[in-house]
Amino acid sequence: MLIETQYLSNSKKLVVSYIDKTGDIKLKYYDWDNPMKYVACDDNDPLRHPDFKSWDGKHVKQIEVAQPDRYATYEFLDSLSDKEKNEIFEFHVPKIYFIDIETEITDTSGFPEAADVKDSDGNVTKEGTTTQVLSISIVYDDKIILLGLKEMPEDMQDRIIKNTNKYFEKYNTNYKLKYIKYEDEFDMMYAFFNKMVPKMACLTGWNFLNYDWLYLVNRSRKLKKWVNGKEYVIDPRVSSLTKKLNKVWSTEFEIPAHRMIFDYMQLYEICDTTIKIKESSKLEFVSNKLIGLEKIKYNGSLQKLYEDDFETFMYYNAVDSVLVQKIHDAKNYISIIYAISSLSRIKITDVLSKAKNNLGTLAITEGVLRHRFKDQMNAIIFKDDEKEG
């Protein structure tokens, strides 16, 4: 299943990422010396294509470009051997990790902002990511990994996993828990970005893109640590196989190239047909409606819970990630995205418009029809590929 493509103009290569039969991400590199794109031209242009025209009957020609557009890239992929195409486009389910963070709360107004708040003139009115990440929960298959900054004795770990399995007992769960304690926030975030994310094919969570992932990326850029006279920083670009973060147009967040990151709340909003009246998109409401379970209740503030009852705090963090996993197990919205990508033979990053909160209908239509366009000698012309769906 095709994830993404990236043209490296310096080396004249096309990088293609896809999911292999093991559910992991693999990269292929193809030589592409002179990428071309179609543009409209005059009837008497000597370079006009002898056969192809635009959908509205205009003559077209191909010109050399530094960066190929989406259609040119798909045309290149379609020209590969059947063996190569099958390997890239064949449907395989990626390994998926459900993630949730908890942050320090020092403001009575609630959770800290995940990004700077700006006025209409671009001036920062409230700084984002001002407080530290206290814990991260990661759920994969039957494994729960908790990252934290406090000691957690074995008996506490035993109670947390016992209570978690009891809370989800109707699913006959048998989760195993691993807790990793870090010296400080820097070490935790460094390990997350440098050692964990590179092993994850697909990351998701609830309101994950607009909060958790955004907070993690922005916060990581603020952290520094001196060890033996040397300053260390965290570069969130290491989360990408090609060390590149792509800014998603009209949003605050950036997505690592060649890695799948989805917001399961967005998938629910787009794909769910079970709840006729969507009164809320909060996890508490949706999990109750879809799987009959809610978030863990606690008294007082979440910050107070962290300070006074670390065990319940980490239990709460773990359950939040498991709730999203169980919504996925029950509804599997993400399989719709996988199927569209595989059937239409387009990048999975083109299936969803993360900015507009809907399906990327234009890209999907192009994928479904592009072979018909070719048979009918029609070329697709892009005017501004940066702002496509």
Task: Give, region by region, the residue ranges found by the protein language model.
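A broad, structural surface signal
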Residues: Y190, N194-P198, N210-R221, Q266, ...
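Conserved RNase H-like, two-metal-ion catalytic cores of nucleic-acid enzymes
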Residues: I3-S9, K13-D20, I25-N44, A72-C202, ...
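Low-complexity, highly charged intrinsically disordered N-terminal segments
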Residues: S54, H59, V93-Y97
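Conserved DEDDh/DEDDy metal-dependent 3′-5′ exonuclease domain
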Residues: G148-K278
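Common nucleic-acid-contacting/processivity interface regions adjacent to the catalytic cores
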Residues: S301-G389
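C-terminal or mid-to-C-terminal helical accessory/interaction module adjacent to the motor/catalytic core
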Residues: C271, K278-F310
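A structural signal for short, well-ordered beta-strand segments and their strand-loop junctions
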Residues: F98, L203-N207, D212, I261-D263, ...
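Short, flexible loop/turn elements at secondary-structure junctions
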Residues: I101-I105, Y140-D142, L209, Q266-Y268, ...
